[in-house]
Amino acid sequence: MNSGPACATADILVAPPPELRRSEPSSLLIRLLPVVMSVATVGVMVTVFLPGSPATRHPTFLAFPMMMLVSLVVTAVTGRGRRHVSGIHNDRVDYLGYLSVLRTSVTQTAAAQHVSLNWTHPDPATLWTLIGGPRMWERRPGAADFCRIRVGVGSAPLATRLVVGQLPPAQRADPVTRAALRCFLAAHATIADAPIAIPLRVGGPIAIDGDPTKVRGLLRAMICQLAVWHSPEELLIAGVVSDRNRAHWDWLKWLPHNQHPNACDALGPAPMVYSTLAEMQNALAATVLAHVVAIVDTAERGNGAITGVITIEVGARRDGAPPVVRCAGEVTALACPDQLEPQDALVCARRLAAHRVGHSGRTFIRGSGWAELVGIGDVAAFDPSTLWRNVNQHDRLRVPIGVTPDGTAVQLDIKEAAEQGMGPHGLCVGATGSGKSELLRTIALGMMARNSPEVLNLLLVDFKGGATFLDLAGAPHVAAVITNLAEEAPLVARMQDALAGEMSRRQQLLRMAGHLVSVTAYQRARQTGAQLPCLPILFIVVDEFSELLSQHPEFVDVFLAIGRVGRSLGMHLLLASQRLDEGRLRGLETHLSYRMCLKTWSASESRNVLGTQDAYQLPNTPGAGLLQTGTGELIRFQTAFVSGPLRRASPSAVHPVAPPSVRPFTTHAAAPVTAGPVGGTAEVPTPTVLHAVLDRLVGHGPAAHQVWLPPLDEPPMLGALLRDAEPAQAELAVPIGIVDRPFEQSRVPLTIDLSGAAGNVAVVGAPQTGKSTALRTLIMALAATHDAGRVQFYCLDFGGGALAQVDELPHVGAVAGRAQPQLASRMLAELESAVRFREAFFRDHGIDSVARYRQLRAKSAAESFADIFLVIDGWASLRQEFAALEESIVALAAQGLSFGVHVALSAARWAEIRPSLRDQIGSRIELRLADPADSELDRRQAQRVPVDRPGRGLSRDGMHMVIALPDLDGVALRRRSGDPVAPPIPLLPARVDYDSVVARAGDELGAHILLGLEERRGQPVAVDFGRHPHLLVLGDNECGKTAALRTLCREIVRTHTAARAQLLIVDFRHTLLDVIESEHMSGYVSSPAALGAKLSSLVDLLQARMPAPDVSQAQLRARSWWSGPDIYVVVDDYDLVAVSSGNPLMVLLEYLPHARDLGLHLVVARRSGGAARALFEPVLASLRDLGCRALLMSGRPDEGALFGSSRPMPLPPGRGILVTGAGDEQLVQVAWSPPP
């Protein structure tokens, strides 16, 4: 409610009257003075009566001592009493003066209380003057004055209670001052002729006894108060009257409170005047109302309380007696009850009849709708173009926002003061429920209805993400509707950039137009015929700006910049909030030239906005507000309502219109409404004024310049991105996403150019941020813009298997997962081979760069090869599981770009990529990082990349971007590509038959011992025992070690006669039984004892072959000083032969260094488990020191490097790595020779 004139309520402490003074004892000096004077008098008398003194001669001299004696006695007797009486008198004078001053203060308080009470409860005869004003319907449920009604005037306690301090005891009290205090309290503890109010509460019936005429006069006064102070949405007034008394209450029919909320008759809402209480109860049974007041003027009396109804009865008849109020057993006599004549009550009711309550609780006068205020009239026939053409310069940017209490339209003009406006910037503050959102919608809709999009654009911002502006997004005037900034902090920085970019854009347009000083001059230049683009005023409305500045204080700098230059740039601000904290504006208040304030939470908030507390005193009615212009003038207004239903006449063609008829308007219910003809169409919902006007605006005027483009919430589709992209300027430049540039108010394709130094790519982001998708998008984009003869891909998928989805592309040669280590290794080998081949090709053909080669390739297809991309998804996993490949990849990244070989990888952190590789990566795509502080692009911007938005990240220049989704069809690309396909990676078969390998090898290998097929070229591979006499085979169980020995044995037999080769097979597990059945068998040993005997004979043979001193150099060169077969000692399961008790093969140790000259060959197979330790055993250590060849078959990698840098790895049976020298390794599949 409106608080009205202030009235003090604090208690007044009245000082108690003084006590009577006690007689005070004299001081010692005063008590001794009479004694001294007496002695002095006696001395004088003695002197006088001495013989020869003058007194003896003249008796007149005796008068002097006698006078001294008398004066002394009188002074001693009377001096003390005189002082006591004088003190009491002074106390009385002081206290009576105090009461006189206090009387003046109390009188002023009483006068202020009179004013306040009469403002709160005015004379009922004056109520009609308040109708239509700000105080009408001000009392709301829950307020202290709700249903508190004046019933008359009389004595009332003083608002400031007079509290007397502790009184002195009765025997010590001063009777004069005590009597004065008693009279003061009796005169001022109450005030006379004060309005007396009683609360009306649901409970037992209230009865008013007395003279019926006076009782009805009091009831009329009470009902008019209820109707003026309370809204019909919150309180209804019913009447239960007999037919004899109905004429006294006929005026009730005019009250909007007396109209039934649901029931209707032929005249509209049914009046709530009934004949009996039961009839009223039945009529109100279906209504859900907080309060109903029923006037009962019948012979019937209520037997108790009626649920939800306050009943006031005309009680017992007492002719000539004043009314007496009876309620709940209490009786209140009224000395001077209020009276309201019937004609005065009728005037009050009929004035209230013109008022209703809108859907938001806002009061309005019939006929004062928004359309009428704006000048539209019938919204259905509204032609925006016509209205815009008729708007003159004065009405430009000027819009009605509501009406004053007397119905005058209130205009908001956001033009600057130089153009007789209120702007350019303003403030709007209103508490929750005050109608602030409706006011903002009203302003926005009015601005659009009265101004063309060429004149005005709107940027609507709602920090909290409410629905204030959502319906306005489709209007041609709206540059953007920005919501939900509170939950999306990065969008606040984006809006800051967008507003700064708009200021920069407008400044640039003014410069290009001839360094114009303002938008006003720019528009005048356009009107005079200058060919300039449209530059409308931008009206920026920011709701909940206080919350925005609270969470993002730096945003005030943007508002300050607009406040300083917005006038010249045509950017107008309207800042709205529920509350305005002192100091929050930080200098912005100097730029706010007009202010609108609705109901505020406190008086201090109202003072912060307007400089007065008037906004706090506004009624709780939504939409009630004050407008303060730059001159300080305050204009009270009620906001127009645009969210209500559109009022429009029914089409005359639907049903014939009945002729008008005259019906009596009484308190009796008219005939019920009869249903019209049943049509064949369903009821069409009534649109709101807002939506109806927005529908009429569609298609009129140019669309507003998009200051705010939609955020990167949804990733684009790659297909659409490629269709819209401009032709690439470089050979390998493709768009893979969208970059958001809010300052430039644009979104541009994220184009990655891989044709030069930026040919290597790294995609870095936290888990589930879209790294794999980004690599797929890159592959798809290149595949869609290049055929398989120009770009090819080989993928290592160590992520979640996403790259397997591109395997169907013709551009993809192979996709290897973590379960395919051989394919991964083979892929690297092929790419390394490609680099070496291209290096030689460039050198032979005088090509100085890969760019030059691409130019030549475009002219001639001869000797063309594609750009090859090694795509690695999951760099950390590759380093962990296939560490041997890392160095090859780093070398490939360093050397490959010069020959058209690229590396693209994904990682979770930049730290996972070693500097040696990171330095080779020129194209860096950074998605959301787990720790934004790890960003290598922009740490501050990295913090703003949203979480749980796969594909969102930063471009190389620190701008926000989103990767496109790869929506292309690989099968369709394969059909479109035609014949060119990426060559697959040749892989070794799981099994190679020995006979087929022998047939394939033919006679090319000569006497070399055939082992199987090598991976690189798929050709047979052999072991040259002539150059390297020994071979070590290592592997786990079931890996094919014995099969490899079986193949070697049979191959030795096949390629050598028995005279040239003999085999000594050491087979403690009997796995090589019957492998050799020819004369090549020197011996088969299956036990340590037998082995010792055989080796003894062998040692004798070897000792005999040692060159004698007389052997010539020619004999040594031709190895002709001895004759006989080479001896092949084939040892299976060497770990069973070399045991802790001894190693029989130790006898051969001294001959191993001379084995090639002596015709000795040692072929040893051993488990790889514990091989790292076993290689220090003397025989094996000697073999390794002599550089023997090794075949590393399947084993555990944790054994470490066994030969050079080679370490075991899981391999299929029969497959192994043949180590033929330092760093020379090749993967082979051992030819399968079945056991006998």
Curated annotation (Swiss-Prot):
Binding-site positions, ATP: 430-437, 765-772, 1035-1042
GO MF annotation: an example: ATP hydrolysis activity
Membrane topology: Multi-pass membrane protein
Chief place of localization: membrane
Record's keyword annotation contains ATP-binding: yes
Entry's localization field: Cell membrane
Residues covered by the FtsK domain: 407-607, 747-936, 1018-1201
Protein name: ESX-4 secretion system protein EccC4
Provenance organism: Mycobacterium tuberculosis (strain ATCC 25618 / H37Rv)
